Design a protein with these regions (language model features):
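Conserved N-terminal catalytic core of the sugar/cofactor nucleotidyltransferase
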Residues: 1-8, 16-22, 29-30, 34-109, ...
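Hydrophobic packing residues within well-ordered alpha-helices of enzyme cores
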Residues: 17, 64-68, 187, 236, ...
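Basic phosphate/pyrophosphate-binding loop/patch that engages nucleotide-derived ligands
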Residues: 102, 115-156
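A short acidic, often aromatic-flanked loop/helix-cap motif at beta-alpha or helix-coil junctions
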Residues: 81, 85-89, 142-143, 166, ...
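Long, low-complexity C-terminal extensions of enzymes
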Residues: 252-295
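Catalytic-core segments of class I nucleotidyltransferases/pyrophosphorylases
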Residues: 106, 127, 156-256, 263, ...
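Glycine-rich beta-alpha junction loops
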Residues: 60, 112-114, 139-142, 164, ...
Length: 307
């Protein structure tokens, strides 16, 4: 199976969050009890991606290096790249060309949070796609503020539009995308939009026009948050808080995913426990390590009952 690398786009000026983001990166803001970037990073980890490129602005890149380091503590490898100015999501593939090399790639936006009972299984399946492009569709009440995809009965994209006045479907496209290696050349050959950006919608259209853009609808039981406004950021924080306090769990616990993926051993988890010992995050890691294996009930969803 072809290797897949990951890119987290953590740039932009986040003017919709001013004055909060006047001096700090949006992706560093807390979503309840963790930095925002933990959530997209955990999604890549669930997909089985171990090599990740973080793209950010010249003034914020060092903060991400300080927060995340080399990835060694998670059994991963992190690289960093500066995006001098925001010129569109598709620019990530051009900036990341050397990093991607001959591999396939997943791009996730640094302000996106996805959650659901089977989300890990879904992301792993998406990451195994060898060719073409694969995106997700999430039902929303008012799709006019999003990229919108229309699909046929087999899950193939048949139309995709950016913030349409008259949407053809109610499926918004979350900010997580899986592509084969051709995405680099596709990104290089698309033309800037009227706002002067290389649009991810045009990348998706290129795959769709080749008949190679598949869509996985995320139905009931899944949550997706784009935390780009104060209200959405607050909603995401409230959601995470409710889940964690009610269930005694942690969403986007990086060491947990690394441990269960067998990328790190107990000694790395113990190191994190010592670092976070005064927090609920650290206490959760202690409980996880004492349990020492993934809860059996997480496998129930793979049984014939749920197929």
């Amino acid at each position: 199976m072809k290797n897949r690398k990951g890119i987290i786009l953590a740039g932009g000026s986040a003017t919709r969050l001013y004055p909060i983001t006047c001096a700090v990166s949006k992706q560093m803001l807390p979503v309840y009890d963790k930095p925002m970037i933990y959530y997209p990073l955990s999604a890549l980890m669930m997909a089985g991606v171990r090599e990740v490129l973080i793209i950010s602005t010249p003034i914020h890149i060092d903060r991400f290096k300080e927060l995340l380091g080399t990835g060694e503590d998670l059994g991963m490898k992190f690289e960093y790249k500066i995006q001098e100015k925001p010129v569109g999501l598709a620019d990530a593939f051009i900036l990341g060309e050397d990093f991607i090399g001959d591999d396939n790639v997943a791009l996730i936006l640094g302000d996106n949070l996805v959650y659901g009972s089977r989300i890990e299984e879904v992301l792993k399946a998406a990451s195994k796609a060898e060719t073409g492009g694969l995106i997700f569709g999430y039902q929303v009440a008012d799709p006019r503020s999003y990229g919108v995809v229309e699909i046929d009965e087999k899950g193939n994209a048949i139309s995709i539009e950016e913030k349409p006045e008259n949407p053809k479907s109610d499926l918004a496209v979350p900010g997580i995308y899986f592509y084969d290696n051709r995405v680099i050349e596709i990104a290089k050959n698309i033309k800037p939009s009227e706002r002067g950006e290389l649009e991810i919608t045009d990348v998706n259209k290129a795959y769709m026009n080749m008949g190679e853009l598949r869509v996985i609808p995320l139905g009931k039981g899944y949550a997706w948050f784009d935390t780009g406004t104060p209200d959405r950021l607050s909603d995401a924080s409230d959601f995470v808080k409710a889940i964690e306090l009610r269930q005694g769990t942690q969403i986007a616990c990086l060491e947990e995913y690394a441990f269960y993926n067998e990328w790190i051993g107990k000694e790395k988890v113990e190191k994190a426990i010592e670092k976070y010992k005064k927090t609920e995050y650290g206490k959760y890691l202690r409980r996880m390590l004492d349990r020492s294996e993934k809860p059996k009930y997480t496998e129930i969803y793979k049984s014939e009952l749920f197929q």
